[in-house]
Amino acid sequence: MKIDDIIRKCIEIPGISIQRSDFSTELLLKEKEGKGSMTFFPLFPGVTIAYIFVNSPTWTAPNFREDSSIEKGPLLLNYCVTGRCEIILNNENFVYVKDGEISLTERFAQKQYVYPRRIYEGMEFFIDIDTLTAQSVWVQGEFDINFHKVVDRFCPDGATYISPATSEVEEILTKLWSLFDVSIPFSISQMKIYTL
């Protein structure tokens, strides 16, 4: 499943609109219960980062259930800066992340994302392993990363990996987080560096 397919499904949801610019795509949530935004920056073929800001108790998830052949999406690496996000995944697993935690999964939300504290801020990497393998060969060659092995180790049988971020990882993610407020296109080159 490609990031463009995910975004297309998202804008089918009432209350969600889209804004595009030269460097990013932004999904905007505006409902009577609250608002939010997800700003997507494509970094490499197969790797996109999204900055997430929510002030709402829920955000409706795109409906991938109508195509029952879709069990897995891209590899999702989520980092919760503040707040808490709870979801029931399409394999019926209930998962949540809270301040300073990371999660890794190939599964997607069934119906909605729930924010018990109402406020949520975080980042999510969308990693399309097939595209990354085919079009960003240098990443795997230079950094000796085999994402299929990452999935096998951390997400066996559709599991979701959740853990507090180590201090080293949190330092990098905090730098990435701060780049959202830096002017474009300088920030994008920095996002690429810290992502690697």
Give the ranges of each region predicted by the language model.
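Arginine residue identity/basic-tract feature
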Residues: 8, 20, 65, 84, ...
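N-terminal low-complexity or simple alpha-helical regulatory segments
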Residues: 1-73
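Alpha-helical bundle regulatory/interaction domains
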Residues: 88-196
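Short hydrophobic/aromatic-rich motifs at helix boundaries and adjacent loops
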Residues: 9-10, 21, 25, 81-84, ...
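Glycine- and acidic-residue-biased ligand/ion/polar-headgroup-sensing regions
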Residues: 54-57, 70-91, 129
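Ser/Thr- (and often Asn-) enriched beta-sheet segments in non-cytosolic proteins
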Residues: 17, 28, 48, 86-88, ...
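Extracellular structured ligand-interaction cores
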Residues: 49, 72-76, 120-124
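Extracytoplasmic
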Residues: 61-63, 84-86, 101
